[in-house]
Every structure is written in structure tokens, then in C-alpha cells.
Amino acid sequence: MPGTGLGRLAKRMTAAAAVFFISTSAVLPAQAATAPAAAPPGVPAALKAERAITTVDNGNLHTWWHDNGVFSPATPTQSSEVRRSSFYDVQVAQANQPQKLYDAFSYMSIPRSGKGKIGYTEEDGAEFSSDARLTMSWSSFEYAKDVWVEVSLRTGQTISSADQVQIRPSSYNFEKQLVDADTVRIKVPYSDAGYRFSVEFEPQLYTAYNDMSGDSGKLTTEAAGNRPIHTEPRNSMMVFAEPKLRGEQKERLVPTEESGSIHYPEPGEVRNLNSVSEEIIYFRPGTYSMGPDYHAVLPANVKWVYLAPGAYVKGAFRFLHDTQSQYKVTGYGVLSGEQYVYEADTNNSYHHLSGASNCHSSCVKMLQFASADAEQKLDLQGVTVAEPPYHSFVVYGNEQTFHMNVENYKQVGSWYWQTDGIELYKGSTMKNTFFNANDDVLKMYHSDVTIDNTVIWKNENGPVIQWGWTPRNIDNVNVANTTVIHNRMYWKDVKYNTCIFNSSSHWEDMGSTTKADPNTTVKNMRFENTAVEGMTNCAIRVYALSDTENIHIKNFNIGAWNGLEWTSQVSHLKRYTNSAGEKVTIGNEVPDGNGLALENYSVGGQVIEKTGGNSSDYQLGRLGFDGENWENWNAWKSAP
């Protein structure tokens, strides 16, 4: 939040001081420190001198700070604290005043929030990220004109050229300048959509490998004898440059007294939201904590939760009732699930899921809604959801009447399995978002859905785009401008639920080929401008459970295949049957143009063509589609 405090530590310190820093949980301002577990590799060995913090809030730029920020790279924070990045500092200047820099708080997430496995020993999906000591930092600000963003590396590692810093998505092509040996300056032009991008210093890059053990292999950072999967920063740094709201947008997305009655929680412990009498809950800048054994189950009168820029809320919200016609969750604040254990079970005192429970019904979700038979709408805008302990967003009830408008949403620190992206319901739109997810990211289960401008950082589990798991009726889906900047999908065996595009086999029995329904149809889905930066495991696997027509994938570009054998990277197009042996159909693509179309699908810059000698399973295209479906797909290069 806006304020003054202590900022950068000195460019160089004595070795003794550096050792002291990495051995403690450094707090700003100074307060009692706690000794953490072993510090991650790359924890600052050379620190920067403290100076006064300066933030700004004018018509063109808004940054904020948390005076209770703590350096805690390996252990949980206290309820009253916000974890500050141990690896990066961020400052922002208006482009016409480049020397007038303002501080933007750099948040940080670590696997399991440093808690370890509490109350369970089974796998939770965070094993590799925890063992490899990965972290994710991010910084947000609002802007209305071009800015310069300075990102400084706190580790003592140095660069000698701005070319040693990569911005992803690389298509942004931002101007970069070297400021000094650990700082790069990035020109971010104003856009009504904003920008969400990764800043990647070369000394921070590492490669994840498959150790080739067992059926699937396991991820490791050891190169010897292993196969490369993907290269990414060990300690990532995301920048969220968000448009400053004005006019009608501000009126729609920022509550005032005219919007309804407002409850303003006080910073600190917040465990009384189940009984508020107002219509709107407004979190002002500050730190709020619900604790590990509570989440807000909101009364029927609450229609809007607003998280102001600089609000940091440790908790989750459940809109229990289905009586409101218009819901809103908006604001550039943070909603963090860091205090919950993985699969926190509300039927088991918020401990890890008990054997008697079903996580879909009883586990904490960061945002949960109930839908009625009457038409309902949700505006979900601006919020950063951090460290979800399970699904980040669900709606239970009538899925055909709940319509969503999602804008400038971000999801970070998704270390656990089942930390999906967002399922969009019938008639919904989503644009200008960032997802770090460890399960299905874009879930295309409903008709009349439009998605545009999505940046994705994909962890191991699940595919990027999913429309399977059960037979469905889907019509009219349009997804454009999707960039996968990183992914760690690594399996050496052929999984049913992976790749960039996927329609998985049935969730009840993924090995079954007899759970399809020819009375359902998936049709008229268009995916345009999908870019995968770096290496990945496979392009598309469709195990059709419904009749399928007119699936058009245009301008799908993969940087490279990972280091596994082609047999691990093969794409599939299969048709399954119902229990009576009736097989679903796929539309005829050659010549009718009603099947699966791959227009300008490329790998490493080479376009894959069905007649070009590069499309087969063992060739560059890796298209191992069933022979019976030969007429149901095509791959070709179209004119620019």
C-alpha cells in the first residue's frame, strides 16, 4: 500500500552480513526474525542498501507497497506479514520522466508456502517445485500512459547486456536497456488491455529433465543421463501492468456508496464475514487474514467483493446462495490461499482431505458460487489469486444460466495438483489474463464462449486447453491469442490428459474406450494464434467421447519438442464407442472442411503439411492419428 519504509539493500555487503541474511527471515521494518529451513539456491548473497520507499498514485500511474513485507524464502509468513520477493526489486517511471522512479512491491510465492506436508504424506503435485526450490515473484501496478519498468536482480548475479534478459511472451518485443550489472529497464507502452509478462535473467535459468525412471519418469534438475524437458527461471518474476480504470469501467468495477451498502473490514484477522449485513465487502489497502481453519461463507445479501490495489487477503470466498442476479469480484488486490493445506477439507476442520469426503463438495476453493435456474452474471476483474490449495474457481448448480465476464485476472503460485484455470460457462467471455496452473488451464466445456489474450505458465499436470473428460454438447467456442510461455509437461509414457490441445478420455475410467455418447456433439470450435515458447511434450490428443465437427486450429506454433523420444510426443485422434459399440463420428475434413483442421501448424518454424512429408508420428509433426480417421483431418499451409 502507499507509504514509506525501507527499500533496497546495498549493492554489496560483507560476506558475514550476506550469510546472516540468508540464515534469517529478514523483516521490513525490523522485527523479530525466525530461522527458516535451508535457504533456496540463489538466495541473495549480495544485498542492496535500504533507502526510503516512494510510491505514487496520480492520474497516470499507481504503485503500492507493504511496510509489513518480509524476506522469507523458505518458511511460512506470519498472519500479519506479506512475503516480499527475495530475488527481485521493481520500480516504475512514467516514460516522459524516466529518472523519477517509484517502488512497486514485489510479492513472492514458494511451494506449499513453506509449510511442508501437514497431515498427509501422499503426493500433492508440489514435489518437484519444492525439491528444486522454485519460486514465483510478481509485481503489479496501474498505468494510463507509457512507462519504464526497472527490474533488479537481488542475488549478486550479474549481466553485461540487456540481451541477457528475455521478456515473455517474446512477441511483445519490448524495448530493453541495461541500467547496471543487475538491473534492466523495460519500456511498456500503454494498452487498454494491459500486459502480463515474465522478466527472465539469464543467470536464473535452469533446465528440468526427465530421469526416465519407471513408466513416466520423474522431473529432476540433474542433466547427466537424463532428457531435457524445459528451460525456465528457477525464481520467476512476473510483471502485471494493468490499465487504470476510468469512466464507465471504473463505475462498473469499483464500488461506491451508490453501488450499495458497504462493509469495510479492518486489516488484521477477518473471521466474521459470514454474517455481514451489507451488500458489498470492500478490502482497502492492507493485510487481512482468515487463518488456516476458516473461509468466508457469505450471506445471501453479499453481491460484491472488492480488493483494492494494495489489499492482500489471506483467505477464500464462498457465495453460498444463488439469489443474486449480478455478482462481482473485482479490484487489483491479492487473494491468497497460502494459509490452507492442500485439499483443505471443511468437513475435517480444514485439515487435509479425509477419506470420507469428496473434495469437489467439501474442499476450500478460492472462489465458489452457486447458480440458480434464473439468469445470473459475474464480473471477475483484476484480482490476483495466489497459492490456491485446490481449484481456484467453481460454480455449482445450473451451469447454463451463469454467465461470466472475466478481465485482467491473474493466477500465480499454483504448486499443487488440481490448481486448474477457470471454467467458463455458457455465454461467457474472458480476456487479458495470466494463468500459472498445475492442471487443465482453459476448460472449454460450454457453448458460446469467447477467450482472448491469455498468457500461460504451465506446470506438470493436465493439458493447456481441455474439452473432454465426459461426453458433452458444445457449440461455438472461439479462443484467440494464447501464449504458453513455459510448461513442464514431462511424461515419457502417453498420457490421456496432456498436450496443448486435449479432449481427454472419460474421468471415471481413462483407459476405457466405451464411455462415449454418439447422441452428444462437440462442434464449431476455433482456436487461433496459439504460441508455445520453448520445448513441449505434444501438440494434440483427442479421445472423442462425442460426435465432433469443425474443430479449426489456426496458426499453432510450437518452439520445439522436448528431449524425449517421438513415441512420447505423438498426437492422437481417436473415436470411442458407447457400451453398445456405437462409435462417435468426426466430420469429414477432406474435402468437406468439417473435421479437424490444422492450418499453419508449425514446429520450430516449419509448417506441418499432410502432404508435405513431415506430418507422420515419427516426423516433425508427430501426428499419429488413427488410419480410420484419414479423411477427418487435414494440415496445410495457407497464404499470409
From Swiss-Prot:
Compartment annotation: Secreted
InterPro entries, sorted: B_solenoid_dext, Dextranase_N-ter, Glyco_hydro_49_C, Glyco_hydro_49_N_dom, IPU_b_solenoid, Pectin_lyas_fold, Pectin_lyase_fold/virulence
Coiled coil start-end: none
GO cellular component terms, A-Z: extracellular region
EC number: 3.2.1.11
Keyword Hydrolase among UniProt keywords: yes
Alphabetical UniProt keywords: Glycosidase, Hydrolase, Secreted, Signal
GO molecular function, one term: dextranase activity
A UniProt-annotated Pfam family: Glyco_hydro_49N
Region (Disordered): 248-269
Removed propeptide positions: 33-49
Function: Efficiently decomposes water-insoluble glucan as well as dextran.
Protein's name in the database: Dextranase
Organism: Arthrobacter sp. (strain CB-8)
